[in-house]
Amino acid sequence: MLNIRSITLLFVMMFAGMAASAQDNISPERKRAIDSLALEKIRDLGRYISIIGSKETEFSEANRVIDRALELFAPGSEMGVSSLYSSDIKYYTVRKYFERLMALNYDRVNIQWYNIQYVSDLELQPDGRYVGVITIYQRFEGTSADGLQYRDTTKKDITVYVERKRTQIAGREIEFWDVLLGDIRVSETRA
């Protein structure tokens, strides 16, 4: 009796896995579209960070941009912060990172992202999501009222999640692939 249940359960799991695998395969054309969407979201995040960090941005506008930026991330994502003055890397929730960025003690802040590129191809995970990593370089410049400057360039690795989602449009359920950003890890900081 136990063997029949075990064999039946094994077949059910095997067929369910094959059906799920067939649904989750991404065609090369779809993968190019997903890659393009992921890079677009990374560029959007770079613009949002620049706006949030700028001292010329009004408080209400910065908060509106924070809300928009948070929509790009998977729940629980964290962002790494580093400095030339310490080897420690501190991680904050995305919202806390944006709040700290907005409150930086500089009179002028300039943040630019460049050299954005995939460093790992999307890989299918057991939960059905695809995961990849995009690397960016961030140039940070902060200037105080008395002219003191801090500058660094940080290499950051951004986890990218691609998952199938569902929505209803005109009463019909539609499936689509969406891209969410995950943790942003600091891999190198230099002058």
Spans of features found by a protein language model:
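Bacterial Sec-dependent N-terminal signal peptides
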Residues: 1-28
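Short glycine-rich, low-complexity/disordered patches
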Residues: 51-54, 58-67, 111-116, 172-180
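Long amphipathic alpha-helical segments
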Residues: 86, 111-122
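Short, low-complexity N-terminal intrinsically disordered segments enriched in polar/charged residues
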Residues: 22-65
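Coil residues (strongly favoring Ser/Thr
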Residues: 36, 83-86, 153
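Exposed beta-sheet edge and beta->alpha loop/turn motif
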Residues: 117-191
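Short, charged, low-hydrophobicity "junction" segments
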Residues: 19-24, 103-114
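Short solvent-exposed beta->alpha transition segments
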Residues: 62-110
